[in-house]
Every structure is written in structure tokens, then in C-alpha cells.
Amino acid sequence: MDQIVRHLKSSRRVFLASHTQPDGDAIGSLLALGLSLERLNIRSALYNESHIPAVYRFLPGVAAITRRFDSQADFDTAVILDCGSLKRIGAAAAAVSQIPVIINVDHHVTNTGFGHLQLIDTSACSTAEIVYRLIKQLATPIDKAVATAIYTGILTDTGSFRFANTNSAAFSICDEMVRRGVTPSEVAQHVYGTYSMGRIKLLNLALDSIEISTNGKLSLMTLTRQMLRETNTLPEDADGIINYAKRIQDVRVAVLIQENGNGESPSNCPGRFHVSLRSDGTVDVAAIAAAFGGGGHCNAAGFNIEADMGELKSKIFDLAQKI
């Protein structure tokens, strides 16, 4: 970490990015480090290819996150946050790979070890936990804005302290963030508080799509673009829906197949899908995701794939027989 701290303090212009379809950890880590570098008068750009979900737009500094990579900016350093591989940042990956020094900050067990400098801790509950430690080493003050970003990252990646990755650091750091001004009830209200009627209707369609493997150990939920159109919702409205499939009695692995693209391909043509996997702790879904070119954690992982929907479902149900 000392080498990374020294390098950041000597950097002229830093590019910071997190993974597409960002969650609270990806956004919180990005903002916390970006705001801290700003305190050091280090010029930086915050990037995420995807729209920021509405539930995270309350975070201080979120308006500074851009979806456009400035190829003329002459960055000397890139910090890639919460990404198992560089390609997880999306279309800008090839251009970003040309930045002289790439720093990889992550907690995923499937991290490829990309970059010139790595700060990877798979025992951390979240990337926000690692960013907290990095900020401490940078010796910049943690004000309420930075504290809110760190708290949100830890809260969401531990499932409100319910997931198996919840560790003692999650509680001690969040305790400190509260003492620095974070109001837990306010953050919870923004992140979990209210659902639109469209999201409720989308949940109804998603629940109706659930299929169970013959051995009862795997549940599969489908979310199509047509469902989004019918309910006037966005992909971000599906956040957390997979947990309903995971709570079914005897289910060890829950799968959500989410259609990407415009959803207008003929049924007999391959489509593009994002597949999310969740485990009850008895199955390593990161290994399953890795077999499809993806990654993640033992209990939460995912991958992108171009395939026929029927064939994809068959492959997934075949896996269920090995559970």
C-alpha cells in the first residue's frame, strides 16, 4: 500500500473507474477515493459507463461521475475499483489500458491481478473497506461526504450486514463513519426506502418467471427487456430481485438471467445476457461464473454471455445436478 500511496501523491492527473451496472460498493468506493484525492489537490476524473441508479444519486459528489472517457486528458494514473478484470469497466477498457500506471483496488477472489500496482484483499467485506484503509494512509480527513460514500459501500455489499462476507471491520468502520456524521436511517431510506409502482409490477413478473431444478436446489429467474417495457422500468429496478429466488426453501443457488440489448432478436437467434448467481454459502458460485468467463465471490458472482435463451437455461439446469 505504501508504494500506491506514494504514487498517488505524486500523480498529476488520475482516472478513477468502477464496474458497469454499478452497485453501492462500486459507486461508494469511486466517490470516497475521488473526494479524498480532491482534498490533496490531485486532479482526477470519475468514470462509470452506466447510468448511476437513482437510489445512489443522493451521495455527495455523484454528479461528478461521467460516462465519457476523455482520451485527450493525458492521465498518468488510473485507479480501477471493484473490478475483477479491466474489461469490467466497459468499452473504455482498451483506451484505459494505455494509461502509464494502472492501480487495481479490489476484493474479488476471481481478480485477474491486472495492472501495474495491486491492492487486493479478498478477506475485505467490500472494496469500500480497502478504500477506507487507503484514505487513512493518504492522511486526508474523512468528512461526512467521504464517510457517507464508505458507509454506503459497506452497507450494500454486506447486504445490510447479513451476508457471509460481513466481518468485524464492517462494523468498526461503519461505527466510525456514523461518528463522522452519517445518519444510518437516512442512508437506508435512500437505498432501501421506497419502490415505484413499476418496480412492484416488475417484481411480480420476475417472481412469475421462477423455475426450479428437478432436485430443488437451484432456482432460475428471468428478466427480459419486454418486462421492462411493460412496467416502464429500468435495469436498475431489478437490483435485489434475485434475493427472492434465493429465499425459496431448499434452494442453494439462485440464478437471474437478465436480457441486455434491445430484446428484439428473433427467439431462435443468440441474445446477450447478464447472469447473476447467488449462493446460500454451500456452493462456490464464483467458480461457476469463472467457467463462463465471469467472476465474483463465493456467494455472489456473475457473467455476461451471448447465447440462445433456451440453451442457456439448459446449461444452467445441467449444473444444478452437480449441486
Regions found by a protein language model. Name each.
Residues R67-F69, A91-A94, Q118-D121, A139-P141, ...:
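A generic local secondary-structure boundary/capping motif
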Residues D2-T20, G28-R57, Q72-F75, T156-F292, ...:
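Hydrophobic helix-and-loop "lid/oligomerization" segment in the mid-to-C-terminal part
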Residues G24-L30, L86-G90:
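Short glycine/serine/threonine-rich phosphate/pyrophosphate-binding segments
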